[in-house]
Amino acid sequence: MSAKRVRTAMTDTTEAAADATTAAADADDRGKVVAIIPARGGSKGVPRKNLRRVGGMPLVERAVRSALAVEDIDLVVVSTDDDEIAAVSRAAGARVVRRPAALSGDTASSESAILHALEQLESAGERIGVVAFLQATSPFIPTDALAAAVREVGEGRADSMLAAHETYGFLWGRGGEIDADAAVDADAAVALNHDAAHRPRRQDREPHYLETGAFYVFRAEGFRTAGHRFFGRIRIAEVPEWTAIEIDDEQQLRIARALAALHETPERIPVRAVVTDFDGVHTDDTASVDADGVERVRVSREDGMGVSLLRRAGIPMLILSTEVNPVVRARADKLRVPVLHGIDDKESALRGWAADAGIPLAEIAYLGNDVNDLPALRIVGWPIAVANAHPLVLEAARVVLRRRGGHGAVRELIERVLPG
């Protein structure tokens, strides 16, 4: 390389380093971008709501992961009064601010929790420039829209931004709710965002935007001055309509779980062993009985192929069943899988098998379907449920499979365990 080219390369490198130093200094001057996730332990509509799972993950962990996925967010904080939420949040990578009881009741506002978190952070020496306020009860936070909003506020193009989706809906209200003093029928329907006498086509209308509650981004200084999240130049961060669900009741939780199964790619389950129940997992939980009292069950050949693939990969498997019927052992022998059946205490049996195999419980997946599986599900790192499992099992599961027992659920689990 010529001396001129060397000098040019050195100059370019020096200028790049100077630019990076200047950018870092500017960021220091502006203060950090902090994501704050309020997540109290109490909830009336959905008990322990922030710890309920969607897509196999507690809601508060989903929010933490969404924030961590945004490169421009420097610090992720969970404000909580609850020990379990705090532990889950720390494990997910968040810093925890303990919220006092006075700010943890049903009437406490999100703003009060955010102000308290800012005070705690600043007393610890942090300088905050921009706040991203995320709600754990919104399980689908679009990280691309969140990242764009953080940039827009950080670059000074907006003071406050909210997640919202486009809507062309015709909104109506009741007369008494709109104007209690008006001389109209209190139950009369009143057009809100349109002229009731004119019905334009969708393509001829301008859209409105419905706030989703998933996230808000704003300048910290402006928030302190205003005392609320909307001030100055307010802009919309547009998000897909399907992400707008916010969980306030059990039905919304079920819908969110269904949406997660539709829209999210299943993650690999990195375990060293697979343990399954038999009835309701390898079978559809039904049986036929002949005149001699002999029970027969239906099993899935697809599951059988999955078990053979797991065996070839050298990953241990065990069938652990309460059932004493000889069909359990017959199927296990056919699959060439060890079996413990006629077991009433599944937890103790599983602990003993894991100890003998030298495999930590945290690295075992247990696949179950009914309440007698709960003790085993609670001690493993990966509690898994078939799609049609008992509600208590679905709630205990880290992952809920898409397939039902006896219809490929075992194969589905194995395909998520095997690498590649």
What is the meaning of each model-derived region?
Residues 5-30, 177-189:
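Intrinsically disordered, low-complexity terminal tails and inter-domain linkers enriched
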Residues 9-12, 26-47, 276-279:
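N-terminal nucleotide-binding beta1-loop-alpha1 segment
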Residues 269-286, 410:
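Asp-based phosphoryl-transfer active-site loop
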Residues 110-112, 116, 138-239:
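Conserved core of the sugar-phosphate nucleotidyltransferase
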Residues 289-300, 306, 325-327, 334-340, ...:
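Mg2+-dependent phosphoryl-transfer enzymes with acidic/Ser/Thr/Gly-rich catalytic loops
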Residues 77, 83-132, 140, 148, ...:
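Short phosphate-binding loop-to-helix
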